[in-house]
UniProtKB/Swiss-Prot annotation:
One of its GO terms (molecular function) is 4 iron, 4 sulfur cluster binding. It comes from the Bacteria. This is Ribosomal protein uS12 methylthiotransferase RimO. It catalyses: L-aspartate(89)-[ribosomal protein uS12]-hydrogen + (sulfur carrier)-SH + AH2 + 2 S-adenosyl-L-methionine = 3-methylsulfanyl-L-aspartate(89)-[ribosomal protein uS12]-hydrogen + (sulfur carrier)-H + 5'-deoxyadenosine + L-methionine + A + S-adenosyl-L-homocysteine + 2 H(+). Belongs to the methylthiotransferase family. RimO subfamily. SUPFAM superfamilies: Radical SAM enzymes. Its cofactor is [4Fe-4S] cluster. Binds 2 [4Fe-4S] clusters. One cluster is coordinated with 3 cysteines and an exchangeable S-adenosyl-L-methionine. It comes from Nitrosomonas europaea (strain ATCC 19718 / CIP 103999 / KCTC 2705 / NBRC 14298). [4Fe-4S] cluster 2 binds at C156, C160, C163. GO terms for cellular component: cytosol. Its EC number is 2.8.4.4. NCBIfam families: 30S ribosomal protein S12 methylthiotransferase RimO, MiaB/RimO family radical SAM methylthiotransferase.
């Protein structure tokens, strides 16, 4: 028999939270903020449903397929665990979630870290003795150690007729420039070698606060994308810009790319090539001006890689207007293109437009566009054969090395394949010579 004085006292079980993150990089950043708060308060993060005391699902609600995936994931978490808190863009439509899954514990909208934490506290009280030293200065990240997403603002002031993001994430709210730059510095100090700058509307940064001057390391910096980009360019790592709306002042960023302060890469959603369709979308409608600007950008920075997204089968789109889009692609010679068929997402103003395009025609046009663009992308990549490029290594194993060049954003663009070499590590910058090219990817040898 063991005496009371010698009995082993079992420490209390540390509460564990499971986490599922769906959607775009902006949602990933929201997830990282919640995870950072959880670790700061002493919670453990469970990799499985079975070991978790409850599960948080960060949802996406941008298009119908994303809604379906989110609802399916919530259902899976309820089946496997039973205690689920829902957040994210689909959370802005609580009635949709409650109708499908009435037993969820709580529902919040996007960028709702405090509300999520309050819901977790209600259903899973936090530990009494959190360990703040478990949280590094850069916070908890879901990306590999060598790259990270840096969100500079929330929301959007535009009212594009195909989009419901403003109804879910609200109007533009820019972060203080000093906070953005300090987070960037913390990430660099932690070993990050590439920052992917994201928001709903990156080029609008600072509009809501009238480009107010902030401070970083004792010097004044305006809350404006050009000034922010210039300061980020001083960190000595790759800076990649995403979700750049084609405002005129975007032209100011191209010289920074030519100078090497920013990666010569621009993710800029043009959406279509027809003036009438662009007007129906409530997007900038002067495609001739866009093409002239692209030529000017390439004159200033010949290596610039341009990525864009397009919608086919928008309500009222005629065959002639679709062919105008193909002609725009031919003239623009974009490096990377993503496209999808218009989907009548509930709440989008475009749903009220006349003459919806039948699904079979949408899919036929989408296939034609992607085939058309594949030839353009293939030709542009072929021009890189024999060139020496600096690449950032993502993975290394017995099958070889997978890296990315300045023209390749993670997960959405192509990659550079290098022969097996275990002297190379993830996060290394390596100079390579391009030996073969494809439609999306490159093959290379280390030099």
């Amino acid at each position: 028999m063991t005496s009371a004085s010698s009995a082993t006292i079992q420490p209390p079980r540390i509460p564990r939270v499971g986490f599922v993150s769906l959607g775009c990089p902006k949602a990933t950043v929201d997830s990282e903020r919640i995870l950072t708060c959880l670790r700061a308060e002493g919670y453990l993060i469970s990799p499985s449903y079975a070991d978790a005391d409850l599960v948080v699902v960060n949802t996406c609600g941008f298009i119908d397929s994303a809604v379906a995936e989110s609802l399916e994931t919530i259902g899976e978490a309820l089946t496997e665990n039973g205690k689920v808190i829902v957040t994210g863009c689909l959370g802005a439509k609580e009635d949709v979630i409650r109708q499908a899954h009435p037993s969820v514990l709580a529902v919040t909208g996007p960028q709702a870290t405090e509300e999520v934490m309050q819901a977790i506290h209600r259903h899973l009280p936090k530990p009494h003795d959190p360990y703040l030293d478990l949280v590094p200065p850069q916070g908890i990240k879901l990306t590999p150690k060598h790259y990270a997403y840096l969100k500079i603002s929330e929301g959007c002031n535009h009212r594009c007729t195909f989009c419901i993001i403003p109804s879910m994430r609200g109007d533009l709210v820019s972060r203080p420039v000093g906070n953005v730059l300090q987070e960037a510095q913390n990430l660099v100090d932690a070993g990050v070698r590439e920052l992917l700058i994201i928001s709903q509307d990156t080029s609008a940064y600072g509009v809501d606060i009238k480009y107010r001057t902030g401070f970083w390391q004792g010097r004044p910096i305006r809350s404006r994308i050009t000034e922010l980009a210039r300061a980020l360019g001083e960190l000595g790592i790759w800076i990649r810009l995403h979700y750049v709306y084609p405002y005129p002042h975007v032209d100011e960023l191209i010289p920074l790319m030519a100078e090497g302060k920013l990666l010569p890469y621009l993710d800029i959603p043009f959406q279509h090539g027809s003036k009438r369709i662009l007007k129906l979308m409530k997007r900038p409608a002067n495609s001739e001006n866009v093409l002239a600007r692209i030529r000017q950008w390439r004159d200033i920075c010949p290596d610039i890689a341009l990525r864009s997204t397009f919608i086919v089968g928008f309500p009222g789109e005629t065959e002639q207007e679709f062919e105008e889009l193909l002609a725009f692609l031919e003239e623009a010679q974009l490096d990377r293109v993503g496209a999808f068929a218009y989907s009548p997402v509930k709440g989008a103003a475009a749903n009220a437009l006349p003459d919806p395009v039948p699904s079979e025609i949408q899919q036929e046009r989408l296939a034609r566009l992607m085939q058309w663009q594949e030839e353009i992308s293939k030709k542009r990549l072929a021009g890189k054969k024999g060139r020496i490029l600096k690449v950032l290594v993502d993975t290394v194993d017995e099958n070889g090395v997978i890296a990315r060049s300045y023209a390749d954003a993670p997960e959405i663009d192509g990659v550079v394949y290098i022969e097996p070499d275990f002297s190379i590590k993830p996060g290394d910058w390596v100079d390579v010579r391009i030996t073969r090219t494809g439609i999306h990817d490159l093959w290379a040898k280390k030099i």
